[in-house]
Swiss-Prot record:
It is found in: Secreted. SMART domains: LIF_OSM. PROSITE patterns: LIF_OSM. GO terms for cellular component: extracellular region; extracellular space. Its main location: secreted. The keyword Secreted applies. This is Oncostatin-M. One of its GO terms (molecular function) is oncostatin-M receptor binding. Belongs to the LIF/OSM family. It comes from Homo sapiens (Human). Disulfide bonds join 31-152, 74-192. Glycans are attached at residues 100, 217. InterPro entries: 4_helix_cytokine-like_core (IPR009079), Leukemia_IF/oncostatin (IPR001581), Leukemia_IF/oncostatin_CS (IPR019827), OSM (IPR039578). Residues 218-245 have a biased composition (Basic residues).
Amino acid sequence: MGVLLTQRTLLSLVLALLFPSMASMAAIGSCSKEYRVLLGQLQKQTDLMQDTSRLLDPYIRIQGLDVPKLREHCRERPGAFPSEETLRGLGRRGFLQTLNATLGCVLHRLADLEQRLPKAQDLERSGLNIEDLEKLQMARPNILGLRNNIYCMAQLLDNSDTAEPTKAGRGASQPPTPTPASDAFQRKLEGCRFLHGYHRFMHSVGRVFSKWGESPNRSRRHSPHQALRKGVRRTRPSRKGKRLMTRGQLPR
């Protein structure tokens, strides 16, 4: 019993180091002990956060960027966020660590963006929708809720008897460091690019979660390399000697 208690104590310390701000939040709230319930919550939260109507679109309208030529510049900078391929290549624990670290950087960047947003009274005078500002202000509480569930899932996985080999996460690729801008307009564009990348990242996160198994001991592997090997095994030469046509390829 003493050995088991010591192992659990060490586990709690490790989780607190990996998810420092989440440990206190989980103490206030409660972690679900049901893996499927917790996974379902994570999937719903990521579905919510990849929706551009909740963050990027309101930001574009408030900042006066809702013009086709300006929208073209709202594209994620390459390497700003971890790619889907990188996320799929991680073990589940490494994936959760990377997700948690990246969201921590996102929270800092959102705080910076909020400071540069116009006030509610200024929006009213400009005839803009105050609801857009309210949506932007809800982004940070939503991320905190997601990080709480990430901590709970990490705790649940480490309490299970899963023997999945863990690949170390690379952590956040430091998405959100604002580049020096010469004027306010450039800062608006930087914020727009950041939010575009954030939504893309959350879409990738949702796709990874969708490949997780129905129990903490079973996970449908989300590695693209295994999917490639399966595709090779399923490929059969045509009996009529015709060339195989890959999906999406138009006939000549």
